[in-house]
């Protein structure tokens, strides 16, 4: 009796099954992050439990602990999703996100500032409630305090890169150093300033955006580059 030939499609099917499992795992992770983001926004950090997140995501609690470094790690993922505009977008490196790429590729200093500022009202609106929850939790949780410091350091470093990109294109006003530009960007674009103007004083996101673009241009750019949009 002849031996049947080996089936040639076994390996591709195994690869397909592996890719399918990876995509299912990624989809589950995204569902958990989105559920966590919603729950943290609604309940605050202290009021959020892993059980609530698991129920919202349709998974068991053990699945969350296998995927994230506890509640603090899940909060970090929720913040990243809020900044990016969703868990799926957060999976892409920052520099590959279209809005960020547009800022990086823009050569005109005034338009570079405007492109950057265009992204900020939405980010602040999504992140500001989480920032308040993080500040409250950081006061009593060392792990959250470290996360708060890390996120602020990352924001400061991001403003340093932005200031360097302005300087590289000759876009800084005479007498303004890269370090000063970094600190101005870091301060003026803080969640605190957004909360004071938009939340406390009732400015519209559009008014805040235009004010921020105009202020940064007037302080940082050479004369002749301050014209409003």
Language-model segments: residues:
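Hydrophobic alpha-helical connector segments
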Residues: 73, 77-80, 84-125, 182
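Short helix-capping/turn signature of helix-turn-helix
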Residues: 45, 68, 136-141, 191
């Amino acid at each position: 009796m002849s031996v049947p030939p080996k089936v040639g499609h076994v390996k591709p099917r195994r690869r397909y099954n592996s890719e399918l499992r990876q995509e299912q795992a990624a989809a589950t992770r995204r569902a958990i992050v989105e559920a966590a983001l919603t729950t943290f926004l609604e309940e605050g950090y202290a009021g959020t439990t892993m059980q609530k997140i698991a129920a919202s995501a349709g998974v068991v609690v053990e699945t969350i602990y296998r995927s994230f470094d506890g509640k603090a790690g899940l909060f970090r993922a929720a913040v990243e999703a809020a900044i990016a505009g969703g868990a799926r977008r957060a999976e892409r490196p920052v520099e590959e996100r279209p809005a960020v790429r547009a800022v990086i590729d823009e050569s005109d200093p005034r338009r570079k500032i405007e492109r950057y500022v265009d992204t900020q009202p939405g980010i602040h609106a999504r992140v500001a409630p989480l920032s308040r929850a993080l500040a409250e939790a950081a006061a009593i949780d060392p792990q959250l305090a470290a996360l708060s410091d890390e996120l602020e350091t990352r924001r400061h470093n991001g403003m340093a890169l932005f200031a360097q990109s302005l300087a590289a294109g000759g876009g800084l006003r005479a007498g303004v150093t890269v370090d000063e530009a970094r600190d101005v960007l870091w301060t003026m674009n803080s969640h605190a300033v957004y909360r004071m103007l938009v939340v406390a004083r009732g400015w519209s996101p559009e008014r805040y955006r235009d004010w921020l673009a105009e202020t940064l241009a007037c302080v940082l750019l050479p004369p002749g580059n301050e014209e409003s949009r």
